[in-house]
UniProtKB/Swiss-Prot annotation:
Protein's recorded name: Ergothioneine biosynthesis protein 1
Primary location recorded for the protein, binned into one broad class: cytoplasm
Species, as recorded: Schizosaccharomyces pombe (strain 972 / ATCC 24843) (Fission yeast)
Subcellular location: Cytoplasm; Nucleus
InterPro entries for the chain: CTDL_fold (IPR016187), EgtD_Methyltrsf_superfamily (IPR051128), MeTrfase_dom (IPR019257), SAM-dependent_MTases_sf (IPR029063), SAM_MeTrfase_EasF-type_put (IPR017805), SUMF_dom (IPR005532), SUMF_sf (IPR042095)
Cofactor binding comment, as recorded: Binds 1 Fe(2+) ion per monomer.
Phenotype of the disrupted gene, per the record: Completely lacks ergothioneine and its precursors (trimethyl histidine/hercynine and hercynylcysteine sulfoxide).
EC number: 2.1.1.44, 1.21.3.10
Any single Pfam family the record assigns to this protein: Methyltransf_33
């Protein structure tokens, strides 16, 4: 007998109480359709040529199962595949065959409500297959209970789960409910777990009507059989099929088919205190089937917190199957308040936990992958320690009070002078041995629950000063999310080292064939820095004068900013010409290849192995030749040398700001949306640059400027964190603007934000564009 685990909850789904509540809404739960007889009748329906949905999906799976398997399965992680509502599994077998052919070990679970029919389907599948790589099991239960115990079916913490939701069953939900249904699964899945889902589009009304009201009246038998299921739940014949007739209605404008049972005459139903009296022609809704255009499908997917990977179309009818993946939580494009909300914190923390719990492991967290930097284990401790130190200024944390020794080891990292490493700002002492990752994860959890969650929930009670501390901690976490990631990619050392935990490989970016186009910018006056006027306090601000009196810097009347962003200044920028896009990998490679082999020094984002060049990405080492159209990322010194070879230079901070203002059509507003660009974890790799005339910014890398970080007029060190900028007024750090694909939107979208790195630093995700006078 095939293994089946019963996860329960059927007694709730099929209870007299749930049916009574449904009848009060003039409907019956559609799950009642699928008793043993109902499943057999539905099987007959799928064999009808009129029921185009089945044939359309079969058409897709026959043609594309191999491609779908490649996208769903991880080649290097354990794979779990769960089908939601498996039915007879004839179509599913096409996918299982493709999984077997791929040669990856897969544990497949078929989920269904009816244990007897599930057992029968699994036995038939086992009798017709002899899989070596695919293990087949069953789960008897409902979707809600599966969500509660989903991790039980994940073979290892890092294993990939792919869900199958076929048959256009998502159409049982209206569009808002469909997105909510997807979100319920997204909330339980890991980043880059997958879902294969089918949608029936808006086919012609005649085709739809025939599919749900066939001339053989099998659909009618199927729908009316729900009354037998109701009677079985109540244990007596409360409903007589002969009192009802099937009514099929398709609303073409709304795009929904509704199946009703209509009372032929007056019907009375009595069971104890339950009493219903249905008048002639009264309608009871049995099920809905919503039809969605491709655009509507994409909206449902996006609102469901998934990202579209690929789409497969049927040639039989307007019907598609989509591979979608759990994406990073969407970050707010335009902050509504100075201090990040709990929802913003939660989105950022999910990224951090993905890094510390999924990407970092015993093989990569103890090695210092970047010279003159700590190993990743330091950052696992640094983030919660920094939060603990600063948030304790607001409220003591009893949960972490006995771990003050962590403060000595993790308060501040190292950033020594590249040219003379003996010169370094003050930093925490390095322990003889680092605490275990589990100890640090528990510490982070305590800091999260007892500090961040409590403070965010009490936001209205916090003073402006206290909100500022909470904001500072949020942006500090965001910065170290990016730092830890660019250190992580340096751990890839072998040519065959690719990982699928971050999803499918990015599409190749072809080498550009044209020089960049030049954008002529006339003499312009710009405002730099955080606005100091009250013109922005209308954006939901409720700050009172009493709040401001407690504020460390009263120039910040709404949004917070770091010390090097303040005060706001006016600058006159002379006319200049700037490239419409950053320098590409291909252009920089051509520049390097003009040198002798002994003089060639490649960017640290590249790796030369056995004479072949690779690029370090979130997906491992990929052939550089496939991504020559991405922006090159290396040090200021490297890119400044390239600019000189082209008879150009790199832009000043004011010039680059002026160009960004022009492209984003911004003036002095604090935040501008970067939706659709390569920042804020909207994707995990740079954008492919283009030869066209578009002005390309936020392409996945920060951008260097020739402006050296210096103490500007009226600069005042950050009172909470005075060493943030002033430790780096050494003439060796250059200002960096924009953001990478891994930069939180509170930072990348803030016009005044200024990053800075040593000009010789090669490891950060920073590119550049050319300028000429």
């Amino acid at each position: 007998m095939t293994e089946i685990e019963n996860i329960g909850a059927l007694e709730v789904l099929f209870s007299p109480e749930s049916i009574e509540q449904s009848l009060k809404r003039c409907q019956l739960p559609s799950t009642l359709l699928y008793d043993e007889k109902g499943l057999r009748l539905f099987d007959e329906i799928t064999n009808l040529k009129e029921y185009y949905l089945y044939e359309s999906e079969l058409d897709i799976l026959k043609k594309f199962s191999d491609s779908i398997a490649n996208q769903l399965l991880s080649p290097d992680l354990p794979n779990t595949v769960i089908e939601l509502g498996c039915g007879n599994m004839r179509k599913t077998k096409l996918l299982l065959d493709a999984f077997e052919k791929k040669g990856c070990d897969v544990h497949f679970y078929a989920l269904d409500l009816n244990e007897a029919e599930l057992q029968k389907g699994l036995q038939e599948l086992r009798q017709t297959t002899n899989y070596q790589h695919v293990k087949v099991s069953g789960i008897c239960g409902c979707f809600e209970r599966l969500l509660q115990c989903l991790d039980r079916f994940r073979s290892e913490p890092n294993s990939r789960i792919s869900m199958l939701y076929l048959g256009a069953s998502i159409g049982n939900f209206d569009r808002k409910s469909a997105a909510s249904f997807l979100r319920s699964f997204a909330s339980r899945l890991n980043i880059h777990d997958n879902l294969l889902i089918s949608f029936d589009h808006r086919n012609k009304a005649e085709l739809v009507q025939l599919a749900y009201d066939d001339p053989y009246r099998i659909t009618e038998k199927f729908e009316k059989n729900i009354l037998a299921s109701v009677n079985a739940v109540f244990g007596e014949n409360l409903f007589d099929e002969n009192d009802w007739e099937y009514k099929s209605v398709y609303d073409e404008d709304l795009g929904v088919h509704r199946a009703y049972l209509q009372a032929k005459n007056e019907v009375t139903v009595i069971k104890g205190p339950m009493f219903f009296q249905f008048k002639p022609s009264h309608l009871i809704l049995i099920e809905e089937s919503w039809k969605n255009s491709d655009q509507e499908c994409r909206q449902i997917i996006e609102k469901g917190d998934f990202k579209l990977v690929s789409k497969y179309e049927s040639t039989i009818a307007d019907y598609s199957t989509y591979v979608i993946t759990k994406q990073f939580p969407a970050m707010l494009q335009l902050p509504l308040q100075p201090c990040p909300s709990l929802a913003e914190w939660d989105a950022l923390r999910k990224v951090w936990l993905f890094i510390t719990n999924k990407l970092l492991n015993k093989d990569n967290m103890y090695t210092a992958w970047i010279p003159l930097r700590h190993p990743p284990i330091f950052y696992i401790g640094h983030v919660p320690v920094f939060n603990d130190i600063y948030l304790t200024k607001i409220v003591k944390n009893k949960a972490t009070a006995n771990k003050k020794h962590f403060w000595e080891w993790f308060q501040r990292g190292i950033d020594p002078d590249i040219e003379d490493p003996s010169k370094c700002h003050w930093h925490s002492e390095v322990p003889e041995s680092w605490p275990s990752p589990d100890q640090l994860r528990e510490y982070e959890k305590e800091s999260w629950e007892y500090h961040i969650v409590k403070l965010c929930k009490a936001m209205d009670e916090l003073s402006t000063s206290e909100k500022r501390i909470l904001w500072l901690c949020y942006e500090h976490v965001a910065m170290h999310v990016e730092t830890t990631l660019y250190i992580y990619v340096q751990s890839f050392q072998n040519a065959n080292q690719t990982v699928s935990i971050c999803g499918s490989l990015p599409e190749p970016a072809e080498k550009l064939t044209k020089a960049p186009l030049w954008v002529n910018v006339p003499e312009t006056e710009i405002a730099v820095g955080m606005p100091l006027t009250t013109q922005y306090t209308s954006v939901g601000s409720n700050l009172q004068s009493s709040d401001l009196s407690a504020h460390e810097n009263t120039d910040e009347l709404f949004y917070f900013a770091w010390d090097n962003e303040k005060p706001m200044r006016k600058k006159l920028v002379s006319s200049f010409s700037i490239a419409n896009r950053p320098i590409s990998n291909g252009e920089y490679l051509d520049f390097i290849n003009k040198k002798s082999k002994t003089e060639r020094v490649y960017p640290k984002q590249w790796a030369e192995i056995d004479g072949t060049l690779y690029i370090r990405t979130m997906y491992g080492l990929l052939p550089l030749d496939d991504y020559l159209g991405w922006p090159v990322m290396t040090s200021y010194d490297d890119l400044n040398n390239y600019a000189s070879s082209q008879g150009c230079r790199l832009p000043t901070e004011d010039e680059l700001n002026c160009f960004y203002d022009r492209v984003l059509e911004r003036t002095d507003e604090p935040y501008v949306s970067t939706e659709g660009k390569a920042t804020g974890f909207q994707q995990l790799h740079p954008l492919a640059l283009s030869d066209n005339s578009s002005n390309q910014i936020f392409t996945g890398a920060w951008e260097w400027t020739s402006t050296v970080l210096e103490k500007h007029e009226d600069f005042e060190p950050e009172e909470l964190y005075p060493d943030y900028t002033r430790d780096f007024f050494d003439g060796k750090h250059n200002v960096v603007l924009g953001g990478s694909f891994a930069t939180a939107t509170r930072i990348s979208n803030r016009r005044s934000f200024r990053n800075f790195y040593q000009a010789g630093y090669k490891y950060a995700w920073i590119g550049a564009r050319l300028v000429k006078n």
